[in-house]
Amino acid sequence: MNRPSLKHFYIKSFGCQMNSYDGERMSELLESQGMKAAEEAATADLVVLNTCHIREKAAEKVYSEIGRLRRPDGSSPMIALAGCVAQAEGAEVLARTKMVDIVVGPQAYHHLPELIEKAASGKVVDIDMPLESKFDALPERRQVGASAFLTVQEGCDKFCTYCVVPYTRGAEVSRPWSRIVKEAHALVDKGAREITLLGQNVNAWTGEDEAGRSQGLDGLIRALAKIDGLERIRYTTSHPNDMTEGLIEAHGEIDKLMPFLHLPVQSGSNRILKAMNRAHTAESYLTLMNRLKEVRPDIALSGDFIVGFPGESEEDFQATLDLISEVGYSLAFSFAYSPRPGTPAADMDNQIDPEISRERLQRLQALLNQQQFDFNQQTIGRKATVLIERKGKKADQMIGKSPWLQSVIIEAPVAIGDLVEVTLTDAGPNSVKGQFLDQKQFATA
């Protein structure tokens, strides 16, 4: 990179875990070009805003962030707008703000070094979508934590009427088996004890193994489970229609596959699910949930919910509350419907009054919060293996993850990357506390 004035970069990622993964890869890419990460945007020569376009509020937040990058003397760093806002708005970004120098989509960020060079002569836009060449061009992972993300699939073919993902991430594409397995080995060699497989519809992954046999995500997970040193496997985000019997059975057969599943449903009303083009019913979703509980009785379940979708009645909303009550979630995410330009739902009649949506969101979130607290309380007394991931606020405090994705607070002389056996002793709304069983059971990576 022949730009000595650009020595330090800062990346801020918004939104989903896929964006977090992309942010990590962009950081590694820029470091491979000789740049160093800055602690804050104020000291960076290049700022990359890795954006989310799922909701209007998330997209607008980015433009506010751009404005804050102007420095007291009137100058600003080189600014690259990456991610899904960049993909959705393209050159319109440059018309909306003069501060952005580079617009780069989520399938083109491997071109970032070249785009930085071009930006010296003028503003540039790259929103091409050649998915696999992106992974080919990225450098090897350098540093990873105890838990690492690994993208195996991108894009979406479902075209839910409220969602921009098919337009910003493109069609469903699965990375080849061999490259996934190779990257997983590399992550473990660098210290990862847990890998989370990522995809917009991760359970839609398909490919051929080394013997040329067709495989689904369950086959890939079975292969990864054989890697020595890899202790835990997770995957997210899934679609109910791609939840195969083989994948369900994997939850009961593979010890390394953690007893946690995030499976969005969005609504408990069949009428609203049809309007959303979800292509499943509340009943079929509940059947999946019950089957998962059969094969893995201790599984913790998570979901996503949208309230205030166009035409949603109080009866429709009550159906969602009823579904939540029947499933019993350990964790879930709820959102008020946000019209996204270019999606069919944005042009539907019977848009819901925002005040009604907010009131429903409060009621729904109260139920979800109670369920999360109840789940945490139900785990008190359980023995659990906890993966230590970071330091806590106190000097002797460490925080790790339980198999059920709970944050576990531990006070003991352990290190990041340790897998420790504890008894869960106390529960709060968002975390639990753990007591060591025996220090001899510590296992340091």
Curated annotation (Swiss-Prot):
Give binding positions for [4Fe-4S] cluster 1. C16, C52, C84
> Corresponding gene?
miaB
Q: Give me the residues that bind [4Fe-4S] cluster 2, please.
A: C156, C160, C163
A single GO molecular-function term is: 4 iron, 4 sulfur cluster binding
Which SUPFAM superfamilies does the entry mention?
Answer: Radical SAM enzymes
How many cofactor units bind, and how? Binds 2 [4Fe-4S] clusters. One cluster is coordinated with 3 cysteines and an exchangeable S-adenosyl-L-methionine.
Cited Gene3D superfamilies:
Methylthiotransferase, N-terminal domain, tm_1862 like domain
**Enzymatic reactions:** N(6)-dimethylallyladenosine(37) in tRNA + (sulfur carrier)-SH + AH2 + 2 S-adenosyl-L-methionine = 2-methylsulfanyl-N(6)-dimethylallyladenosine(37) in tRNA + (sulfur carrier)-H + 5'-deoxyadenosine + L-methionine + A + S-adenosyl-L-homocysteine + 2 H(+)
User: Secretion signal: which residues?
Assistant: none
The EC category is transferase
* Boundaries of every TRAM domain copy: 377-438
Q: Which InterPro entries match?
A: Elp3/MiaA/NifB-like_rSAM (IPR006638), Methylthiotransferase (IPR005839), Methylthiotransferase_CS (IPR020612), Methylthiotransferase_N (IPR013848), Methylthiotransferase_N_sf (IPR038135), MiaB_methiolase (IPR006463), rSAM (IPR007197), rSAM_horseshoe (IPR023404)
Cofactors per UniProt?
A: [4Fe-4S] cluster
Protein's name according to its UniProt entry: tRNA-2-methylthio-N(6)-dimethylallyladenosine synthase
**Keyword Transcription regulation among UniProt keywords:** no
